[in-house]
Amino acid sequence: MADSDDEYDRKRRDKFRGERSDSYRTERRDDRRAVGGSTGARDEWAERNPFRGGASAGGGGARHRPDYSDYRGPGARPRYGSPGRDLPPAKRMRPDWGDGDVRANPRFGGYDPYLMQAWNDHYQSMHSAFSHAGHAPPVRESIGGGGSDTLTQPAMLNLKQFLDTQDENISDSEVMRKYTEYKTDFKRQQLNEFFVAHKDEEWFKNKYHPEDSVKRSEEQRGFLQRRTDVFVELLENGTIGSVKVDSSQGDALIRVLDTCVIKLEGGTDEDLKVLDEKPKDLVVYERKTEPMESVKAMEKAISSPKEEKIREEDPLPAVVSPQQKTARSVNSDEENWNDEDAVTKKDLGEHSKDTDSKPEDKQLNKKKTKKRKRNSSDDDSSSSESSSSSDEEKLKEKYDVEDGLRAEQKAEAEKDRQEAAKAKQEPESSKLEELVGKEITEPKELDSKINTVENDDTLKSPEMTPNPIKRTDNGNGNKVEDEEKPSVDENKVVETETIDLDKIKDGQPRALHRTSSIFLRNLAPSITRAEIEAVCNRFTGYLRVAIADPLVERRWYRRGWITFMRDVNIKEICWGLNNQRLRDCEMGAIVNRDLSRRVRPANGLTAHKQVVRSDIKLCAKIALNLDERFRLWAEVPTDDSNSARADESSENGSGSTYGFNSKNPVLQNITDYLIEEASAEEDELLGLTGENKDTEGEAIERDEQLISVLDRLVLYLRIVHSVDYYNHCEYPYEDEMPNRCGIIHARGPAPVRVTNNDVQEYIKTYESKLQQFLTKTVLLSDEEIKDLGAKDAETEVEKFVQANTQELAKDKWLCPLSGKKFKGPEFIRKHIFNKHDEKVDEVRKEVQYFNNYLRDPKRPQLPEHPGTSKRPESESARGGGGGYRPPMYPPFSAMPYGFGPPMMGGGRGGRNFPPARRELPLEHQRRLIGYHDLDAPANSDMFD
């Protein structure tokens, strides 16, 4: 009774403990006294001691389990036990993986193609006993720890677990037959579930859909054919032969790659002259920050009421590229970025007049002031809007790290620009009469006059850089420009220089090989290319988009690259994309930097003659394999016989693979360079056995003729097939990437000496790294895919007809597709094939779609469960807590973790199965036989 009274007094004195601060309770917990018995410190109360609740209170302590704070991460522990104490696994209310896998990950936009409840039902139906004590394995484990997003297949039963689901009188042969069937059905089920989960996604259709995959293949083949034409052109004019794939010739290699890119972009020989020009310093564009003088000039500018109304009613969002000025002018969130172009459009427009009335000017200026000044005191009704706009401005300032020049520099730049514009007015107006009667040669004539303006513009914003996409006829554009210049005021002359730059740029070579790009870190599998293009087409200068293949470790999310023209303000476009969501998915747009090192060195050992000859052989094999895969050079009349000989020789692995007439120019007479030569007789007569070479090494021997042949092959693989040979990798979907032919690996500096063992080891290792290009992809046969659950088209059509044939009553049948009623099922069949033949065709395409997925030996699928793929024999036979996989059944009753009574097999290494169950068939079990020594005395004691 005394104990109860004391405990009641303590509770009453501490009744406000829930309102005290966490730090106070932590101190009280740390300063507690270690007093035994029931009258000890408060830390020994039942609700405070997690170890007493279940034992002394008959399980009542389960209401106060402290596990929840452990899974919330770092934070205060309100009222439970010491942070240093961890409960045994048997006390856990939920498993460690409860939060990570069941709930949708917010950064993936709630997308999860696999219904976790369905997985749980499927797995728990076989393993219902796992609900005890939270020891069940996760239905879907993550590879690489709990923080990984990698999905896996559910765990497959091993043979021991499968035996426990069968009858005890089953034979060994029957067990093995059923277990084989179980594994086959399990694999079929996983393939079918994966197909159903991803069949509506664009990336999956591009791989296996009977129509979409053909379109995608033809598109890729068109890219390759275009690259082949460019390579042949460069090979014929000597560009390819004039360069060596050495890291010392990095500039020449970059020039060749850029030449290819310009040709691929549709450039001409005139555009190639841009490669001879020194690149400008203005590479990374910054946000435009104009001086206040230009803002005031913009406010004084005159525009028609029609244009002003269009600007006010424009529904486009605020943050767009500065190049997108055909639709609207300055918005409330853009401040002064588009002021120059707004004035420019007024200069060129037919409705801009200098004779507008003064009241109208005041009214227009008042409207512009309201649109530009966020803190305007004249607008009383927009206080909340101005505060939100100021927040937006702060975010933009934080987003744009490199923000303009200082006020003094901007003022000086503005002054210099105005003086240069005044100096230009007289020469340009004198040329107006000459431009009317002859072709325009103004770009050359004005180069020297524009240099000073361009230097000043370099200190300003990239918006002054012209956009080569927006072009009109040079003659008309220049004529209109020059006619308007005499009538404009001083401020407008400054603004029209953008048009002058556009005019001059039209006659100059185009830098088509240089682009700006944005990287999308997070694209859901359900997002299509058309949706991304619809968003990007709003921005002027958009070129293309590349979407990578999905990754299983990222839950099939993809990455993307959006390519724009070089002269756009890429940061503003990136800001606009970050303010948009596609299918409730944040794309995570960031600016993609330019390539840092385009020519990267490889091992210098590759220049050795023996290695070069081996590389020629490997390059020729890869070129043949890839040409045949994409049907390049397939117009040869004897293609069938040649390909058959190529297949036969590739299986043999001999150099005779290249002994046929190929239309590929880099493979012609290739066998002449594959025959090795050596002065064996001379070495034998002189006693040069090569022992010294093996020990001391030999100098690098270069054969320029072999190297030139190899360089042609390496450049062919790099330009046509996007294979970087010296990096033993392929750059996928390069035709859609921002940098076509961006990176190449070349031979690095050669070592002084090299041993024969090093050479042989290098050749062997490098060939193993290139196996992915040397082996041909062979699709699975009909018999092989039948084991994987392939479908038959006619069978599926019959199932479709039966599913759409419903009997309502006697001699009364319904077709759900049309809602019509018929007297018999045969009429419905005829009706479906006649009126709904498109539905029948869809069923056949679906069957072909699924079978195409099964035929691919490298088909994407979920990785196997770790318990299925990694199950050592010694580990799988162990039970309890020491085994690799959890036991099939829990320990006996509610025993503590790892404990088992005698002869029950609990604990580490124990059996952990009820004794009534068996582990092996009856044939492998025998009756226990007792042994007794017949020579022993009758009543003797047994000591051993």
Curated annotation (Swiss-Prot):
<dbReference type="InterPro" id="IPR021933">
    <property type="entry name" value="SERRATE/Ars2_N"/>
</dbReference>
<feature type="modified residue" description="Phosphotyrosine">
    <location>
        <position position="80"/>
    </location>
</feature>
<feature type="region of interest" description="Disordered">
    <location>
        <begin position="852"/>
        <end position="887"/>
    </location>
</feature>
<feature type="compositionally biased region" description="Basic and acidic residues">
    <location>
        <begin position="8"/>
        <end position="34"/>
    </location>
</feature>
<dbReference type="GO" id="GO:0016604">
    <property type="term" value="C:nuclear body"/>
</dbReference>
<protein>
    <recommendedName>
        <fullName>Serrate RNA effector molecule homolog</fullName>
    </recommendedName>
</protein>
<feature type="modified residue" description="Phosphoserine">
    <location>
        <position position="643"/>
    </location>
</feature>
<dbReference type="GO" id="GO:0030422">
    <property type="term" value="P:siRNA processing"/>
</dbReference>
<feature type="compositionally biased region" description="Basic and acidic residues">
    <location>
        <begin position="391"/>
        <end position="448"/>
    </location>
</feature>
<feature type="modified residue" description="Phosphoserine">
    <location>
        <position position="429"/>
    </location>
</feature>
<comment type="subunit">
    <text>Interacts with cbp20, Dcr-2 and pasha.</text>
</comment>
<keyword id="KW-0943">RNA-mediated gene silencing</keyword>
<comment type="function">
    <text>Acts as a mediator between the cap-binding complex (CBC) and RNA-mediated gene silencing (RNAi). Involved in innate immunity via the short interfering RNAs (siRNAs) processing machinery by restricting the viral RNA production. Also involved microRNA (miRNA)-mediated silencing by contributing to the stability and delivery of primary miRNA transcripts to the primary miRNA processing complex containing drosha and pasha.</text>
</comment>
<dbReference type="InterPro" id="IPR039727">
    <property type="entry name" value="SE/Ars2"/>
</dbReference>
<feature type="modified residue" description="Phosphoserine">
    <location>
        <position position="332"/>
    </location>
</feature>
<dbReference type="GO" id="GO:0005654">
    <property type="term" value="C:nucleoplasm"/>
</dbReference>
<feature type="compositionally biased region" description="Polar residues">
    <location>
        <begin position="321"/>
        <end position="330"/>
    </location>
</feature>
<feature type="compositionally biased region" description="Basic and acidic residues">
    <location>
        <begin position="41"/>
        <end position="50"/>
    </location>
</feature>
<feature type="compositionally biased region" description="Basic and acidic residues">
    <location>
        <begin position="342"/>
        <end position="364"/>
    </location>
</feature>
<feature type="region of interest" description="Disordered">
    <location>
        <begin position="640"/>
        <end position="661"/>
    </location>
</feature>
<feature type="modified residue" description="Phosphoserine">
    <location>
        <position position="304"/>
    </location>
</feature>
<keyword id="KW-0539">Nucleus</keyword>
<feature type="modified residue" description="Phosphoserine">
    <location>
        <position position="352"/>
    </location>
</feature>
<feature type="region of interest" description="Disordered">
    <location>
        <begin position="291"/>
        <end position="493"/>
    </location>
</feature>
<feature type="compositionally biased region" description="Basic and acidic residues">
    <location>
        <begin position="291"/>
        <end position="314"/>
    </location>
</feature>
<dbReference type="GO" id="GO:0045071">
    <property type="term" value="P:negative regulation of viral genome replication"/>
</dbReference>
<comment type="similarity">
    <text>Belongs to the ARS2 family.</text>
</comment>
<feature type="modified residue" description="Phosphoserine">
    <location>
        <position position="82"/>
    </location>
</feature>
<feature type="compositionally biased region" description="Basic residues">
    <location>
        <begin position="365"/>
        <end position="374"/>
    </location>
</feature>
<feature type="compositionally biased region" description="Basic and acidic residues">
    <location>
        <begin position="479"/>
        <end position="493"/>
    </location>
</feature>
<keyword id="KW-0597">Phosphoprotein</keyword>
<dbReference type="Pfam" id="PF04959">
    <property type="entry name" value="ARS2"/>
</dbReference>
<feature type="region of interest" description="Disordered">
    <location>
        <begin position="1"/>
        <end position="101"/>
    </location>
</feature>
<dbReference type="InterPro" id="IPR007042">
    <property type="entry name" value="SERRATE/Ars2_C"/>
</dbReference>
<dbReference type="Pfam" id="PF12066">
    <property type="entry name" value="SERRATE_Ars2_N"/>
</dbReference>
<feature type="compositionally biased region" description="Acidic residues">
    <location>
        <begin position="332"/>
        <end position="341"/>
    </location>
</feature>
<dbReference type="GO" id="GO:0050829">
    <property type="term" value="P:defense response to Gram-negative bacterium"/>
</dbReference>
<dbReference type="GO" id="GO:0031053">
    <property type="term" value="P:primary miRNA processing"/>
</dbReference>
<feature type="modified residue" description="Phosphoserine">
    <location>
        <position position="641"/>
    </location>
</feature>
<feature type="compositionally biased region" description="Polar residues">
    <location>
        <begin position="651"/>
        <end position="661"/>
    </location>
</feature>
<dbReference type="GO" id="GO:0035194">
    <property type="term" value="P:regulatory ncRNA-mediated post-transcriptional gene silencing"/>
</dbReference>
